[in-house]
Design a protein with these regions (language model features):
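Helix N-cap motif at beta-to-alpha junctions
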Residues: 12-13, 83-85
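A short, acidic/glycine-rich surface segment
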Residues: 37-39, 61-67
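Short glycine-enriched loop/turn motifs at secondary-structure junctions
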Residues: 1-2, 70-75, 105-106
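Core segments of cupin and vicinal oxygen chelate
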Residues: 8-51
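Short amphipathic alpha-helices within nucleic acid-binding modules
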Residues: 19, 86-91
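Vicinal oxygen chelate
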Residues: 8, 30, 38-41, 80, ...
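Short, charged/polar surface micro-motifs in flexible loops or helix N-caps
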Residues: 46-50, 60-62, 85-87
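N-terminal beta-strand motif that seeds the catalytic metal site of vicinal oxygen chelate
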Residues: 1-17, 76-78, 125-130
Length: 130
């Protein structure tokens, strides 16, 4: 068993696709519709066959409440690994991203937090060397 797909709820799939591709630098992997349902995923261009992130339209009341609650408490909806959190912070910030936390050293890692403009906080994580 392995993790091949995970998801984040978004309030607007087109807006999310622009943010995750143009600002974060991911590549669109899948985009198709069946009736009112749209299946939309992105993946790292460095690992085109790696884990995909589904940008799922949040049209569920319970999911919306959860999404809003973790956002308000400063909790990330997803975490992405990077080898260079400070470099990615500068690159992504230059593309217009709003960071709620600049690169910060915490136990065994350096993290930064940004707003994906679609209802989520995203954490960038660079693991420390042990």
């Amino acid at each position: 068993m392995k993790i091949k797909l995970t998801s984040v709820y978004v309030d607007d799939q087109d807006k999310a696709l622009r943010f995750y591709t143009e600002v974060l630098g991911f590549a669109k992997k899948a985009d198709f519709s069946q009736g009112p349902f749209r299946w939309l995923t992105v993946a790292s261009p460095e690992e085109s066959d790696g884990t995909e992130l589904q940008l799922a339209l949040n049209d569920n009341a319970a999911a919306k409440a959860y999404q809003q609650a973790i956002f308000q408490q400063g909790q990330p909806a997803a975490m992405f690994y990077t080898d260079d959190v400070k470099g990615d912070y500068e690159r992504i910030k230059a593309r217009g991203a709003e960071f709620t936390m600049p690169p910060t050293d915490v136990t065994a890692s350096t993290i930064a937090m940004l707003n994906d403009t679609c209802g989520n906080l995203i954490q960038l994580t660079q693991l420390g060397r042990h």
